[in-house]
C-alpha cells in the first residue's frame, strides 16, 4: 500500500543540501560546466567520449571541459589544489544579472533553471570573484518577484493560475502554494468550516492500514 509523502524542506539556500529533500536531490544533479586544472588519472573511462574507437589512456588531460553534476563538482573542487575551475551558467552571469535588476518579473525562471535560487546559492561554494554580485542578484531577484507571487496567490481564488505557476522556480512554487493554502483556509473560516474537526492524514492512513491488515 502506498504511503503519503510529506515534503521535506530544501536546505539548498544554506551551506549544504538536505538529501532527505527530493528538491535538493534533483537540484544537485543539474549539470555544471567545469575545466580540469590538473590531469586526473584513471577517470577518463567514466567521462571522456570513446566514439570513433580512439585508443586513449584512462587519464583526463589538463584543460578538459566537462559537464558534471553539481554534487560531483562540489566534491572535486579544492581551492588549494585547483583540481578544477567552474564556468558560471549564463543565467548567473553579468548579462542576466542586468536583466534581473531591470525587471525580474519578466523572466521565466522555471525555463531558465527550475532550482534557480538553490542552485545559485550552491554556486557560492566555488569562491568565484563574482560571488558577491551573484548573492546580491539572487536576493534582489527574490525580493522583486516575491510581492507579485504572493499577491497573485491571494487574489486568484478558484482561478486558473497555471500560466503564472509555470514561470516560477520550485521554491517560488512552494511559496505560491503556501499562499493559496492560506487563502483557502481563510475562506473556510469565513464559511464557518474551520471549526469542524477532521482526522489528520496520519490518522486516516493508519486506519486504512489497520483495516487492510484485518482483511488479510
From Swiss-Prot:
GO terms for cellular component: CMG complex; GINS complex. Residues 1-16 are annotated as: Not essential for folding and stability of GINS complex, but may regulate accessibility to the central complex pore. The keyword Nucleus applies. It is found in: Nucleus; Chromosome. It holds the Pfam family PSF3_N. Its main location: nucleus. The keyword Nucleus applies. Keywords: Chromosome, DNA replication, Nucleus. GO terms for biological process: cellular senescence; mitotic DNA replication initiation; multicellular organism growth. PANTHER family: DNA REPLICATION COMPLEX GINS PROTEIN PSF3. Belongs to the GINS3/PSF3 family. Component of the GINS complex which is a heterotetramer of GINS1, GINS2, GINS3 and GINS4. Forms a stable subcomplex with GINS2. GINS complex interacts with DNA primase in vitro. Component of the CMG helicase complex, a hexameric ring of related MCM2-7 subunits stabilized by CDC45 and the tetrameric GINS complex. Required for correct functioning of the GINS complex, a complex that plays an essential role in the initiation of DNA replication, and progression of DNA replication forks. GINS complex is a core component of CDC45-MCM-GINS (CMG) helicase, the molecular machine that unwinds template DNA during replication, and around which the replisome is built. This is DNA replication complex GINS protein PSF3. The gene is GINS3.
Amino acid at each position: 500500500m502506498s504511503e503519503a509523502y510529506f515534503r521535506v524542506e530544501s536546505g539548498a539556500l544554506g551551506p549544504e543540501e538536505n538529501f532527505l529533500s527530493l528538491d535538493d536531490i534533483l537540484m544537485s544533479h543539474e549539470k555544471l560546466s567545469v575545466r580540469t586544472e590538473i590531469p586526473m588519472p584513471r577517470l577518463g573511462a567514466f567521462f571522456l567520449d570513446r566514439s570513433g574507437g580512439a585508443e586513449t589512456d584512462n587519464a583526463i588531460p589538463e584543460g578538459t571541459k566537462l559537464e558534471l553534476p553539481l554534487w560531483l563538482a562540489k566534491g572535486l573542487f579544492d581551492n588549494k589544489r585547483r583540481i578544477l575551475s567552474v564556468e558560471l551558467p549564463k543565467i548567473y552571469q553579468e548579462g542576466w544579472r542586468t536583466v534581473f535588476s531591470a525587471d525580474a518579473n519578466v523572466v521565466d525562471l522555471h525555463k531558465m533553471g527550475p532550482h534557480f535560487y538553490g542552485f545559485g546559492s550552491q554556486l557560492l561554494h566555488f569562491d568565484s570573484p563574482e560571488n558577491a554580485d551573484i548573492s546580491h542578484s539572487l536576493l534582489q531577484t527574490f525580493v522583486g518577484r516575491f510581492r507579485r507571487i504572493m499577491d497573485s496567490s491571494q487574489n486568484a481564488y478558484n482561478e486558473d493560475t497555471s500560466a503564472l505557476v509555470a514561470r516560477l522556480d520550485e521554491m517560488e512554487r512552494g511559496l505560491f502554494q503556501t499562499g493559496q493554502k492560506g487563502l483557502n483556509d481563510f475562506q473556510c473560516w469565513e464559511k464557518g468550516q474551520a471549526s469542524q474537526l477532521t482526522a489528520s492524514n496520519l490518522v486516516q492512513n493508519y486506519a486504512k492500514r489497520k483495516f487492510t491488515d484485518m482483511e488479510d
